[in-house]
């Protein structure tokens, strides 16, 4: 099993798909990494040589991924909340921040419905 950026990549997957197991790498970035390393997208992870894996690690080191990316995202949201802007306010209240309606729908952000009887008391 190949270990890249602290993540175990499933050996039976193709290189392009296997790289997407790393947070911060999607299909497009995985393809670009494979192109830069001269590796076929359809080549299985278990068939990659140690040299190929080292090339992939070097390419991935150029990007912000995994813990650093998660930390950066969290800090961006925290900054929005600290400066008190509209988006930060919506994050703090757990509501959608991109203009969606909230009178109905928005259940993903708001969570399960509260009982109507409990609200009237």
UniProtKB/Swiss-Prot annotation:
Q: Under which name does UniProt file this protein? A: Small ribosomal subunit protein uS13
UniProt GO molecular function:
rRNA binding; structural constituent of ribosome; tRNA binding
Spell out the Gene3D superfamilies in the cross-references: 1.10.8.50, 30s ribosomal protein s13, domain 2
Q: Which gene encodes it?
A: rpsM
**PANTHER family of this UniProt entry?**
30S RIBOSOMAL PROTEIN S13/40S RIBOSOMAL PROTEIN S18, SMALL RIBOSOMAL SUBUNIT PROTEIN US13M
SUBUNIT field: Part of the 30S ribosomal subunit. Forms a loose heterodimer with protein S19. Forms two bridges to the 50S subunit in the 70S ribosome.
- Summary of the function given for this chain in its UniProt record: Located at the top of the head of the 30S subunit, it contacts several helices of the 16S rRNA. In the 70S ribosome it contacts the 23S rRNA (bridge B1a) and protein L5 of the 50S subunit (bridge B1b), connecting the 2 subunits; these bridges are implicated in subunit movement. Contacts the tRNAs in the A and P-sites.
Species lineage, top-down?
Bacteria, Pseudomonadati, Pseudomonadota, Betaproteobacteria, Burkholderiales
Location of the region described as Disordered in the Swiss-Prot/TrEMBL record: 94-121
Keyword tags: Ribonucleoprotein, Ribosomal protein, RNA-binding, rRNA-binding, tRNA-binding
What's an example GO BP annotation here? Answer: translation
Q: By its UniProt entry, which PROSITE patterns does this protein fall under? A: RIBOSOMAL_S13_1 (PS00646), RIBOSOMAL_S13_2 (PS50159)
GO cellular component: a single term: cytosol
Superkingdom assignment: Bacteria
Family (UniProt): Belongs to the universal ribosomal protein uS13 family.
């Amino acid at each position: 099993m190949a270990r890249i950026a602290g993540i175990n990549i499933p050996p039976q997957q193709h290189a392009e798909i296997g790289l997407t197991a790393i947070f911060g790498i999607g299909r497009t970035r995985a393809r670009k990494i494979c192109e830069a390393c001269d590796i076929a997208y359809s080549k299985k992870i278990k068939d990659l040589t140690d040299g190929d894996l080292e090339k992939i690690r070097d390419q991935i080191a150029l990007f912000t991924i995994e813990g650093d990316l998660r930390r950066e995202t969290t800090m961006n949201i925290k900054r929005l909340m600290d400066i008190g802007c509209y988006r930060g306010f919506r994050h703090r209240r757990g509501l959608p921040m991109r203009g969606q309606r909230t009178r109905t729908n928005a259940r993903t952000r708001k969570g399960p419905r509260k009982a109507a009887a409990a609200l009237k008391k």
